[in-house]
Amino acid sequence: DLGSSTKEGGECSFKSLEAATSDLASNKIDVLVTAPINKDNIQSDGFDFPGHTEYLAKLSNVDNALMFMCSDNLRVGIVTGHIPISKVAQTLTQENILAKIVQMNASLIQDFVINRPKIAVLGLNPHAGEKGLLGDEEKDIIAPAVKRASEMGILAFGPYPADGFFGSTGYKKFDAVLAMYHDQGLIPFKALTFGQGVNYTAGLPIVRTSPDHGTAYDLVGRGTASLSSFQSAVFLARDVYLNRAFQKEVSLTPLK
C-alpha cells in the first residue's frame, strides 16, 4: 500500500496528532510542526474536522483561528477557510472580516515583531465588484469592515481586486494580505512561493506550523520530494516561539 490512502494510515495520523498535542499541553515540547494529512482518511469519531486548523482551534478553545500562509516575502490570511466556495458569500460578514483583520494585526505584532503592520484586504468579486456592478459585498460588507479596522488604529487598506493586486506585485507594499476565501489566497501564494511557504495557525495560544503542500502520494518512494517547505515550517515555529517570548519579556520589563 506504499503511496496510497489507507484506513490504517489515517488512524496513525490521528494517533500521532493526539500524542503531539498531549505533549504540547503538558509542556514536554514547545511548538507543534504538523506533517500533511489526508483530510479524508483521518476522519473518525475523534477527528471530525476539515483540517488541522479547525481541530487545533477546538482543542485550544479558540472560536476563530486564522489560516496564515507565510514566506519570506508574502503572508496571506484567509477569512472563510475550509468551506465550499458556494457558501463563501453567505458566510462573509463585517464582523468576521473585522475579526480576521484584528487577529492578523495582533499576530503580525506578537509573532512577527512588526510594530505597525500594513494589511491589504482583497475583494470578493471580479474587479472588487466594480462599485456594485459585479456584486455588492465590497461596498456593503468588506469596505465597512476595513473602515472599522482603520478607526481602531489598524493600518488596513482595500478592498483590492485580487487579480491585479498580485499581478502588479502590489502585495510587496504590505506586511500581509487578507483573502476572502481559500483559493483566492492560496493560488497566488503557492504560485509565488511554492516549496518555501509555511501554513501557520495564528490566534492560538500554542505555536503550530505546517508545510504548504499535501501528502503527495505520487512522490512516495521516488526520492524526489523536497524538504524545503517542512524545513521552513520548523524554522518559523522556532522564530514565532522566540518572538512571543521576547514580546512577553518586554511587556514585563518596560523601559522606564
Which residues does each PLM region occupy?
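Short beta-strand
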Residues: 68-69, 113
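Conserved hydrophobic/aromatic beta-strand scaffold that supports enzyme active sites
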Residues: 55, 67, 76-78, 206-208
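Ligand-binding beta-strand-loop-alpha-helix segment within the catalytic cores
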Residues: 69-99
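Contiguous, glycine/small-aliphatic-enriched amphipathic segments in soluble metabolic enzymes
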Residues: 1-52, 95-180, 184-191, 195-199, ...
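A glycine-rich helix N-cap at a beta->alpha junction
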Residues: 53-64
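Short beta-strand/turn micro-motifs at beta-sheet edges
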Residues: 66-67, 109
